Swiss-Prot record:
<dbReference type="InterPro" id="IPR036056">
    <property type="entry name" value="Fibrinogen-like_C"/>
</dbReference>
<dbReference type="GO" id="GO:0005581">
    <property type="term" value="C:collagen trimer"/>
</dbReference>
<feature type="signal peptide">
    <location>
        <begin position="1"/>
        <end position="29"/>
    </location>
</feature>
<dbReference type="Pfam" id="PF00147">
    <property type="entry name" value="Fibrinogen_C"/>
</dbReference>
<keyword id="KW-0176">Collagen</keyword>
<keyword id="KW-0472">Membrane</keyword>
<dbReference type="GO" id="GO:0005615">
    <property type="term" value="C:extracellular space"/>
</dbReference>
<keyword id="KW-1003">Cell membrane</keyword>
<dbReference type="GO" id="GO:0046872">
    <property type="term" value="F:metal ion binding"/>
</dbReference>
<feature type="binding site">
    <location>
        <begin position="282"/>
        <end position="284"/>
    </location>
    <ligand>
        <name>a carbohydrate</name>
    </ligand>
</feature>
<keyword id="KW-0964">Secreted</keyword>
<keyword id="KW-0399">Innate immunity</keyword>
<feature type="site" description="Mediates specificity for sialic acids">
    <location>
        <position position="300"/>
    </location>
</feature>
<keyword id="KW-0430">Lectin</keyword>
<keyword id="KW-0677">Repeat</keyword>
<feature type="domain" description="Collagen-like">
    <location>
        <begin position="55"/>
        <end position="93"/>
    </location>
</feature>
<dbReference type="InterPro" id="IPR014716">
    <property type="entry name" value="Fibrinogen_a/b/g_C_1"/>
</dbReference>
Amino acid sequence: MELSRVAVALGPTGQLLLFLSFQTLAAQAADTCPEVKVVGLEGSDKLSILRGCPGLPGAAGPKGEAGANGPKGERGSPGVVGKAGPAGPKGDRGEKGARGEKGEPGQLQSCATGPRTCKELLTRGHFLSGWHTIYLPDCQPLTVLCDMDTDGGGWTVFQRRSDGSVDFYRDWAAYKRGFGSQLGEFWLGNDHIHALTAQGTSELRVDLVDFEGNHQFAKYRSFQVAGEAEKYKLVLGGFLEGNAGDSLSSHRDQFFSTKDQDNDNHSGNCAEQYHGAWWYNACHSSNLNGRYLRGLHTSYANGVNWRSGRGYNYSYQVSEMKVRLT
């Protein structure tokens, strides 16, 4: 109202000047306080009035009390695994554990007290035929097939033919170390046979079964195989008995021959000619490591043959050679 009276007192010219003054002030404050209010004067004239700028903010009020906790949110995804931290300090030593059970005897103890032959196993009460561990003179353990049933038992089997599943036409190295399977046919190895028969006097038994189920055998007073330096020479005692007859004495003192080492007395290689490995002379009366030909065969003397038994044209179903310390 006071402003209106001032404007009337100034007259039209004063009102115009007052209006221009306010316009100038409004332009200067446009950047900070741009709001302009237009008010009416008497008559049709109007006057624009600039609203003042807001004052400075007052001081902050006291902090209000904390609101109630909101509901717990869902668990977030696992973060990336961090690096392993440094090792912690070494813990205290734990208490001493309970004493363990007594273990199996060591090899040295087993060698000192273990069996040397299948016959020794038999005297210790092992009456079942099968594979057993014995210890050679150099303390080497050897798994062997023990025949505890035939002719009083206690025989160590070193050769077995039974089904033709194993190839016996092999080289010197194979016969040296042995080959075959515990489940069927095998040759124990000339080194092992030498070690077994070097312990003392051993008798030899040869058991044969034909494909008609007929059993034959031949038994010798002594049997030994020399070492490799003597080419595994056959050292054989006299023939004792047996319905198979004697077809091994003609091989006495002969060296062992294979397809790759010819040590026989023949101009050719008996091992190659008769497809085997044996103590060939020139050439053989027996060939138990020959081809597995399943009974009668038209080829000559190249099967599992025993001349004084079924002759040179019959290959036995089963052949076993075994020794027993006397």
